[in-house]
């Protein structure tokens, strides 16, 4: 359970083309957690503890905004500093200075350029900060703030509010990310299948990076057809420390594509369609040998991943098409609308990695307890069906 008490003081003033905002914040966080957990690494272990954390956070921030007289140029410069009393590595404001800068300039009436850069800090999860070992000791006190340096730059071309084309490139660099000492996987790379994240021994040594380019266009044709599309090409990687090699992160889908259009028909009818496509995410195969051990399976009742082959496999690309039809009635003082929405009209199947499960039957009951194994089976994970929706909208 988390409970926050926050105090924030802020002042904003303006002078001609300048706007200045400065302030300070003081937060007190109470975190409580009662854990009973069985894990199996090389042998079975049990963690049974109660945690209470009372953390005092403090910070300073300031931003200066400037807009030129002709409004062609805008700039924003900011600085923030954060600290807390949880651990020695987190107590100094100067260790968590977060500068940020954004610029925008209209080169012509139709073409504009923009860019931004910033450094941001974030606390590790409270589940990790409050984790205790079998001797009831907080063992992650050495954790520090996570940081991300972010850069982006782009161009935008617009014509008569009828057509807009934007291209933007970005780069993000992550540092001091908590990594699991047991399996060497950063917490940010652990997806939903991992359950609770952070309740283990951690070290702030992992690094990550993501970079890519995004293209966006909007087109309004004859006030009837409205088209919009975007495609993002990117790469997401991580490494456990500075000496190791980068490998694919859990979010490395490579590309995301969307296109949608709406056509306005006579008598207040409209028809819309959307097509979405996303690249397959990488995944880690199971460690069948470890998972089949009776002592290992009984410790957590789910399979174990083969971290020596982390994210070596990749899921299939998934695409989906949706259609929506609207009919609108404009009455004297209100608007009444009816629509039918058909999601996934092709009934495309989203295929996930097969799940490894125990049958509950021991294959070698005559073996010693530590060597007994379950017979295992796999269950396919395919989802996706046509989903119709009928709706009514009313505005007064």
Q: What function would you assign to each model-found segment?
A:
Residues 14-18, 68-71, 106-110, 148, ...:
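Outer-membrane beta-barrel channels and translocator barrels
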Residues 175, 227, 277-301, 316-320, ...:
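C-terminal beta-signal and adjacent terminal beta-strands/loops
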Residues 7-13, 60-66, 101-105, 153-157, ...:
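Residues on the lipid-exposed face of transmembrane beta-strands in outer-membrane beta-barrel proteins
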Residues 1-90, 106, 163-166, 224-230:
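Face-selective signature of the C-terminal outer-membrane beta-barrel domain
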Residues 32-39, 105, 109-151, 171-196, ...:
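Surface-exposed extracellular loop regions of Gram-negative outer-membrane beta-barrel proteins
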Residues 15-17, 26-32, 56, 68-70, ...:
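Transmembrane beta-strands of outer-membrane beta-barrel pores
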Residues 4-12, 48-61, 140, 144, ...:
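Outer membrane beta-barrel strand-and-loop segments of large Gram-negative receptors
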Residues 67-73, 171-173, 194-285:
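Gram-negative outer-membrane beta-barrel transporters
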